[in-house]
Structure formats: C-alpha cells, structure tokens
A protein has these predicted regions:
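Membrane-interfacial loop-to-helix junctions in multi-pass inner-membrane proteins
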Residues: 1-17, 33-42, 85-86, 154-157, ...
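Alpha-helical transmembrane segments in multi-pass integral membrane proteins
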Residues: 1-3, 25, 29, 55-66, ...
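Structural preference for long, well-ordered alpha-helical segments in enzyme cores
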Residues: 4-8, 18-22, 82-90, 242, ...
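Hydrophobic transmembrane-helix microenvironments that flank and shape a buried ionizable site
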Residues: 5-11, 44, 49-50, 73-79, ...
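Hydrophobic alpha-helical transmembrane segments of multipass membrane transporters and ion channels
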Residues: 10, 14-18, 22, 231-235
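Hydrophobic alpha-helical segments with transmembrane-like composition
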Residues: 12, 56-109, 113, 129-132, ...
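Membrane-interface helix-loop-helix regions
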Residues: 13, 20-77, 110-121, 196-202
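Small-polar-interrupted transmembrane alpha-helices in polytopic inner-membrane proteins
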Residues: 19, 98-116, 163-174
Length: 297
C-alpha cells in the first residue's frame, strides 16, 4: 500500500507543486514587476493539501470570477488525490467479495449527492462527492475486466462496429445533452450516462487486441504524446497566459479570425513544447524513482 502511494506521489506531486509555486508566487511577482496589479483570491492552503476544488466552489458561489486559470486548473488533480487516498484502502482491507459492493456504493452515494444538489451547478461540477461518480464508474470497469473473464474477453475482441457504437453513444450524449436531460434531475443524472460512455471507450481502447482502424493505439502520434497529457493539462493555462501577455505587449489585437487563429496555434505549439521539456527534464527524474516502489512482487 505504501508503495502505491509513493508511486502516485512521484508521478503527480512534482509538477503539481511546481505549478502552485508558479501560480501563487512567480506569476503574481512577475505581474507586480511589470506594473500589473491583480488580487489573488484563491487560498493557497487549499491547494497545498489537495482541497482546491472546495476553494473553487467557494469563489464561484461568492461571485469571484477573476480566478487565474493557472490556479483554478488544480481542482481536478485535488479530487483525484482525495480519491486515491482512500480508494486503495477498499482493496487492502476489505475482503475480495466486498469489492464490487464497495464500488457500487461509491457510485450510488455520488448519484444521491448529485440529486440532492441538482440545482447547484458548481457543486455538481466541482464537489468531490459529485465527481466520485466518474472515478467510481472507472473503478467498476477496471474491476469487471480484471475479475470477470467474460468482460475481459468482450473488450479484448471488440469489433469495429462496437467501437463505432461507443463513439456514437458518447458524441450523441454530448451534443444532445440538453435535450435528453431536460427535466428536474437531468443535470444531476445525465453525468451518469456520459461517464458510462467514456468508460466504455477508455476500456475498449485499453483492452482491445482487434485489428481495427478505431483502435487508437494505431495512431502513433497520439500514442507518443499520451505520456505528456498530465503535463499538457497542468501547463496549458500557463502557456495560454504567456501567449495572451505577449499579444498585449506587442499590441496584437484579437479582433479578427486570423489573429485569433494564429494566437491559438502558437499557444498550442508552446504548450506541447513546454510540456515535453517539463516531462523529459523534470518529471522524468521522479518517474525513474518509481521502480524503487514496485507494487508487483
């Protein structure tokens, strides 16, 4: 159990805390140095202990909109760390026959909490108990493919048609979300179906051995950049902010499509470059230490 936590720490914490240092220290100092005044409303202590999602809820519900994206982006990582703090305990201390019941209980509790707060969009989107639904459904699929042979075989031998069906289901739920869930508890329970469709796609992509063009492992570019996704997620607000500052410094107006398009492309390219540098020369040092805490004997 200790090795699991250490491996998690070595992968997540180094970049997470580097972003916090930038967002709460370096960025405000840089703004002050060039004469830009700005008040930071986020509470750094919430971020330090992985409770930033609650800080974000507080700011949104007190109508504080000027939240730097480099500070706000941490909320989902906080929820993941909260989740992974207790999730391994289920499998470490409960008998195997209780695992499925525990996973289903987490999902049920999250759905009930979402229904209780069906009118509060901030709670539905950022509260830990609301988002546990996604992680619980992911855990359910992981349980099924590792503990149930039929589920494992189904996803391993999945056909192109079924792959396509999963994508159609997902995009249909996304595009027709408002129409499909336009009822009292729709906002609360609509997430169940969307999360389920995402879990189907992820599990199929992770498990499939079928030779199908919808097996995204065949897309080498996407596979290559897959290891950089955590870096891209946390660093893209910083790169967007830098690009925005540059456009202001050089008086580049964002009033036409061409300028906006060029700015967007440059921001994306910068994000990929910075993310690769971060992973190759910073994060990888800690990742290489993970072998000392192997969870497989």
């Amino acid at each position: 159990l200790g090795n699991f936590y250490m491996r998690r720490i070595l992968r997540i914490w180094p970049l997470y805390f580097a972003v916090i240092i930038f967002a709460f220290v370096a960025y405000p100092l840089a703004k002050s140095f060039i004469g830009i005044k700005g008040e930071g409303f986020a509470n750094i202590m919430y971020h330090m202990v992985f409770l930033s999602n609650f800080d974000l809820i507080h700011m949104k519900q007190t109508n504080i909109d000027a939240i730097p994206t480099s500070q706000a982006i941490n909320w989902s990582v906080s929820i993941e760390e909260q989740f992974y703090l207790f999730w391994p305990l289920i499998f470490a201390f409960l008998p195997k026959k209780m695992w499925l019941f525990s996973i289903l209980s987490v999902i049920a509790i999250s759905i009930l909490f979402r229904m209780q707060n069906y009118e509060n969009k901030d709670i539905l989107y950022f509260h830990t108990l609301s988002v546990l639904l996604d992680l619980g459904i992911g855990g359910l699929f992981a349980f099924l493919v590792t503990q149930k042979k039929q589920a494992e075989e189904f996803f391993k031998n999945i056909s192109t048609r079924t792959h396509c069906l999963f994508f159609v289901l997902f995009f249909g739920l996304i595009f027709y979300n408002q129409e499909l869930f336009d009822f009292k508890y729709g906002l609360a329970i609509g997430r169940v179906f969307i999360s389920f469709s995402i879990a189907l796609i992820i599990t199929a992509q992770a498990m499939t051995t079928s030779n199908t063009f919808l097996n995204l492992k065949n897309f080498k570019l996407g596979t290559y950049w897959g290891k950089y996704t955590y870096s891209i997620y946390l660093l893209h607000p910083i790169c967007l902010t830098f690009s925005d500052v540059c456009s202001r410094v050089f008086n580049i107006p964002m009033v036409n499509f061409i300028n906006t398009f060029i700015w967007g492309v440059l921001a994306i390219v910068l994000t990929f470059i910075v993310s690769k540098i971060s992973y190759d020369y910073y994060e990888s040092y800690f990742i290489r230490l993970k072998h000392k805490f192997s969870i497989l004997k």
